[in-house]
Amino acid sequence: MRYAWPMQSADSLEQLRLKLAQFSSERDWDQFHSPKNLAMALVVEAGELVEHFQWLSPDESVNLVAADKREVAMEMADVLMFLVRLADKLDVDLIEVADQKLERNHLKYPVEKARGRATKYDKL
């Protein structure tokens, strides 16, 4: 499916994947989108996200002013887009692997042992 600009909002990871692939292809950026480069870009964007919280108290981090919240949202979008692009390049279904990981975590962190605790699974 080809999208015209401005693109309609994506309502699934698959639509977002397709839109990002088209965006990259139209600009001949696939040559730069190796898994290594995408992973590095993802980490850079995650670092930019963390910068917004670096010196805030836990309460301040929950109660961001609107302008800061918008900037945080934009950094979150950058992280998501690089993650989706990386998954596309490595042919990883993010929903499928997230479900698998959640199931593993369910087994590692049983409610009766982990509830209300921030302890690693091997120390429960």
Question: Which residues fall in each region the model found?
Answer:
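Flexible "arm" and connector segments at domain edges
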Residues: 1-76, 80-124
